[in-house]
């Protein structure tokens, strides 16, 4: 991939993200205004804010992405599916679900598959991205869950929530891309704070960047790590 992709082109890769528990309606409106101004691919928000984002982004090419089962993934699959169904009904174009990490760590791969399939079925025409939380997984576990995602046929595999240990790395994106090939896209999320990071992840195979630092990225600036 082109490692000298321009900042303007980078904007089309970015899910402009605000998932903090203290995020207010006013902050979500600002997020949407920024996404319109910079032509980001989507805004990524908690499901309660999907209707507001749909309202704010009317007649605008920016899509709405909702997280589901976020950030732990440790809820009933039926509850994740219901949240996804409601978000899609409210206008979400994309769903980012968190897998049941504990089941994957326990080697219960069929249960992990069932969890993903249940949410996938609830998404209808919306694209499903599956967050695997790479910072908590061995390489073997990353490969196993990416293979499941490939077989189920989800739209994306995604590195991280940004709430757990670690974030997106070039090595993880390369590993995920090697497993899914062209069958799924790859979203790199977690700790992407500058243009160089974004370019490196795209060069490694990422099709999408999840970041709260989208404006800094396209402006060639850097956001310091959160504390």
From Swiss-Prot:
GO molecular function: deoxyribose-phosphate aldolase activity
Record's function text: Catalyzes a reversible aldol reaction between acetaldehyde and D-glyceraldehyde 3-phosphate to generate 2-deoxy-D-ribose 5-phosphate.
Subcellular location field: Cytoplasm
UniProt family annotation: Belongs to the DeoC/FbaB aldolase family. DeoC type 1 subfamily.
EC class: lyase
Biochemical pathway: Carbohydrate degradation; 2-deoxy-D-ribose 1-phosphate degradation; D-glyceraldehyde 3-phosphate and acetaldehyde from 2-deoxy-alpha-D-ribose 1-phosphate: step 2/2
Protein name: Deoxyribose-phosphate aldolase
Catalytic residues (positions): 96 (proton donor/acceptor), 158 (schiff-base intermediate with acetaldehyde), 187 (proton donor/acceptor)
Gene name of the record: deoC
Catalyzed reaction equations: 2-deoxy-D-ribose 5-phosphate = D-glyceraldehyde 3-phosphate + acetaldehyde
CDD domains reported in the protein's UniProt record: DeoC (cd00959)
Entry EC number(s): 4.1.2.4
InterPro entries in alphabetical order: Aldolase_TIM, DeoC, DeoC/FbaB/LacD_aldolase, DeoC_typeI
HAMAP family documented for this protein: DeoC_type1
Transmembrane segments: none
Keywords: Cytoplasm, Lyase, Schiff base
Gene Ontology BP term (one): 2-deoxyribose 1-phosphate catabolic process
Biological classification of the source: Bacteria, Pseudomonadati, Thermodesulfobacteriota, Desulfobulbia, Desulfobulbales
Cellular component terms (Gene Ontology): cytoplasm
